Amino acid sequence: MKKIVLLAAALLLAAASFAQSEYNYQKRSLFEQLPIRGNDIVFLGNSITDGGEWAELFNNRHVKNRGISADRSGWLLDRLDPIINGHPKKLFLMIGTNDLAVGIAPEEVAANVEKLLDRFAEESPWTKIYVQSILPVNGVDTKAKPKNHWKKGAEIIETN
């Protein structure tokens, strides 16, 4: 019986590590309803992107923020269709910080970015893509950041 309980707990913990948040699902649903058009400039990524008021900063209504806090490269691949189908003029991509924080290998992050680039090359070749490097995360103000984010300097360098 003890083994069954331990196995069940391990399975639940494993599933939780792959689970997306309610916030993620809500943002994905919202983005599926908001169209991307051919003259749009899309910012795609995680919380760094999500937190930016890009349309206001650039004073351009064609700038669309498609960042979702805590997003990972694999999850991002699952939500590309509405963006690719809109054939945006430009795409700015910043992803990978959260992948590295949960132990996803730099090679897997790079492979996911390559898959994204391949899809755009095939389905929206006129979209100009800017792949932004993963920003370094230091140990300053570690109480406000999960510790797994600020111990990944080597992985960030390798991924970039």
Residue ranges and their predicted role:
Residues 124-128:
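A short helix->loop->beta-strand "cap" motif at the edges of active sites that frequently abuts
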Residues 106-116, 153-160:
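Charged helix-capping and loop-helix junction motifs
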Residues 139-160:
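Substrate-gating cap/lid alpha-helix
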Residues 1-4:
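Positively charged n-region of N-terminal signal peptides that target proteins for export
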Residues 14-16:
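N-terminal signal peptide c-region/cleavage motif recognized by signal peptidases
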Residues 67-71, 92-100, 114, 134:
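Cell-envelope and extracellular/periplasmic
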Residues 18-90:
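Serine-esterase "nucleophile elbow" of acetyl-processing enzymes
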